[in-house]
């Protein structure tokens, strides 16, 4: 079973949902950013170090995946996503893009 780690801006929530849904039917395991479907600040209040910890955890997901898939609608890649792509390339993971 293939493990796909999805990366991209959280502004693309609907696209993350779409790709996660499709992964289920392809028999793939989808790894998504932390709390993809919860508004952390609204639900739990400001968490000062949450983003740093979530970013580090997402890199551990990249460590265990077979492939990284970048959700980059209109070619948009933010700073955090760029960091994840650079990390994936550094450790030899294949990286595919929604928009090339």
Model-derived regions, located:
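Conserved catalytic or regulatory cores that recognize and/or transform ribose-phosphate-containing ligands
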Residues: 1-100
């Amino acid at each position: 079973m293939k493990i796909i780690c999805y990366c991209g801006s959280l502004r693309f929530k609907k696209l993350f949902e779409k790709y996660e849904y499709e992964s289920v039917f392809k028999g793939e395991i989808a790894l998504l950013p932390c709390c993809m479907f919860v508004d952390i600040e609204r639900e739990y209040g400001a968490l000062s170090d949450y983003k740093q910890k979530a970013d580090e955890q997402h890199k551990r997901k990249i460590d265990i995946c077979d492939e990284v898939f970048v959700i980059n609608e209109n070619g948009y890649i933010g700073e955090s996503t760029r960091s994840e792509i650079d990390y994936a390339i550094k450790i030899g993971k294949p990286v595919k893009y929604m928009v090339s």
